[in-house]
Design a protein with these regions (language model features):
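Surface-exposed, active-site-proximal loop segments in enzymatic domains
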Residues: 81-101, 127-143, 176-178, 331-339
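Bacterial N-terminal signal peptides that target proteins for export
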Residues: 1-9
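N-terminal carbohydrate-binding accessory modules
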Residues: 23-95, 279-280
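Aromatic-rich peripheral "rim/lid" segments of glycoside hydrolase catalytic domains that contact
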Residues: 299-371
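Bacterial N-terminal signal peptides
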Residues: 9-19
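Active-site region of glycoside hydrolase catalytic domains
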Residues: 29, 142-263, 270-295, 314-320
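Aromatic-lined substrate-binding rim segments of carbohydrate-active enzymes
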Residues: 60-128, 186-201, 304-312
Length: 371
């Protein structure tokens, strides 16, 4: 789809005033426009951090993150993530969402600014919820799709000009597998939401996740949205047999990292990220690794984290670990020997050391995990 008139106006005005920098040279070979970013977005330092807990956040949370060296928080507005066909009473959904936005406005943003942390505003559960296959219903029901677009218009109007926002993360892990309604497929629905944001706020970055639950593979067919300051996000939990071993099925076998018998190592993670790297280079895109993790009892979890972080650093990507003070299985402040065993608070462990080394810039492309 070609940029509409308002989009072209934003791009032209920015280029004429010198406020917009195009991160790649001209159009790409497929005719899509190169990504464009304002100078302040291009000048951001590397940002490293965590996913928020689902609960309200406290001063202690932010103090801990600052002490660790984190500079980025992905604030997830989440509830009923596993429910089927939830979040369909839109009046009630809006009341819940306003409550989360109030907490973001009154607590999260001020505390984050105080501690030098930028915040991603993440809509983790869309209006209309998910069907039994976890496909978002808004791709197949115009009522939910239209509501999604308009809620982002309201959010952008409310937070226009506010400091400390890394970007508006339009929807977490979108999944559209079946044919969508016209103008409601993954790309077009996110385009419509981005257009609504830009009608209210021409500057704050928009964060777009690839289809198939933010899959790196989906970057192969992704086209940039025709707006300034769009950041492209992926998640990596590969191989799932390692990162999620015995999380949903306690009878799964135990897998160690790395496992060369399966070809599971740093080079294999790098291979799965090739479509993201190609997209970044082709369009000059800013890229953000929004989620990665390995469950606490996975043998070699700390090596997996170091390998992921070293790749993010190699490619110049911001990143956030999943998750901070959420479930103990992901928490680096707990140690758990196996599923069903009690979680033990832990002030120091190999996974936490890996994460803090990452925050403090001590993991580079030349310093992956050691066997």
């Amino acid at each position: 789809m070609k940029p509409n008139r308002s989009t072209i106006s934003i791009l032209v005005a920015g280029c004429l005033t010198g406020s917009v920098a195009v991160a790649a040279d001209g159009p790409s070979p497929d005719g899509a426009s190169a990504c464009a970013y304002t100078a302040d977005v291009l000048a951001r330092p590397r940002l490293r951090g965590v996913m928020s807990p689902g609960r309200d956040m406290t001063e202690d949370d932010f103090k801990a993150l600052a002490d660790w060296g984190a500079t980025l928080l992905r604030f997830q507005m989440i509830r009923d993530w596993h429910s089927v066909n939830g979040n369909q009473d839109l009046d009630e959904y809006d009341r819940w969402l306003e409550g989360r936005l109030d907490h973001f406005d009154r607590v999260v943003l001020p505390m984050a600014r105080k501690h030098g942390i930028l915040v991603v505003l993440d809509l983790h559960v869309p209006p209309g919820g998910y069907d039994a296959s976890h496909e978002a219903n808004m791709f197949h029901d115009a009522r939910f799709a239209d509501h999604f677009v308009e809620l982002w218009r309201r959010i952008a109007r409310r937070f226009k000009g506010r400091e400390g926002i890394y970007g508006y993360d339009l929807v977490n892990e979108p999944l559209q597998a079946r044919e969508a309604l016209p103008d409601c497929d993954h790309w077009n629905l996110l385009r419509r939401a981005a257009e609504a944001v830009r009608a209210e706020d021409p500057h704050v970055p928009i964060v777009v996740e690839s289809n198939q639950c933010a899959s790196p593979s989906q970057f192969a067919g992704l086209r940039p949205l025709p707006f300034v300051n769009v950041i492209y996000q992926f998640h990596v939990y590969w191989p799932w047999e390692f990162t999620h071993q015995r999380v949903l099925n306690t009878r799964m076998w135990t897998v160690e990292w790395p496992d060369d018998s399966h070809g599971w190592n740093r080079a294999a993670i790098d291979w799965t990220l090739k479509p993201v790297v190609a997209f970044q280079r082709k369009y000059g895109a800013r890229v953000y690794a929004g989620e990665f993790s390995a469950v606490a009892w996975a043998p070699g979890a700390e090596r997996y984290l170091r390998d992921c972080i070293s790749l993010f650093e190699e490619h110049g990507w911001d990143w956030t670990y999943h998750a901070f003070r959420e479930w103990s299985g992901w928490s680096v402040e707990h140690e758990t020997a196996a599923p069903g065993r009690p979680s033990v608070p832990s002030a120091d462990n190999p996974r936490k050391r890996a994460l803090l080394d990452g925050f403090r810039g001590r993991i580079s492309a030349a310093q992956p995990s050691e066997r």
